[in-house]
């Protein structure tokens, strides 16, 4: 500091102090912050808005980490985040970190979103029919490719003949009978997914069911007396 004055004889005078040591910085906390914009619904994109974020010590390069119910989400380190099925029912936050102009590490965390809402995901894959479309053969509903992002529930089956449900045909297999000959068979698989939505898929139809020839049952008997002039009759009542 310099002190100056005019002495009693009218001469201007001044004296200057010794210099202090270098002034040390006091780290300033960030002001403003980060907010999340976007709709917290599956498949929507959330964005970290840092327009109000400031630091008297200078902002550095910003890094991002999104979290689900407080747990960091692997790989979610950009300024936006696309919500997935895993986020449904969870609250999302984002932390923004940086090194300020004085070398101090700083971070701010957004307020949490409301719980992420589900969007129904249609079934993937489907159901196919394995087996031969011939009378007396067994058809099987193959669901090995069936999947649902919302989680599969218990599977229910309904077999149909030319589009009409077959009474009692509600298992994963169906044995073809005479009534099926000449018709096309399908199977519908239904379930309630993990989010409570009723879903169903239907197989492609088989070719027309072919007939298998059956040997006759019962037979023919002769009634009457085997005597000259008597009449014999062919009895086919059991045929």
Tell where the protein language model's regions lie, with residue ranges:
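Ser/Thr/Pro/Gly-rich low-complexity disordered regions
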Residues: 1-239
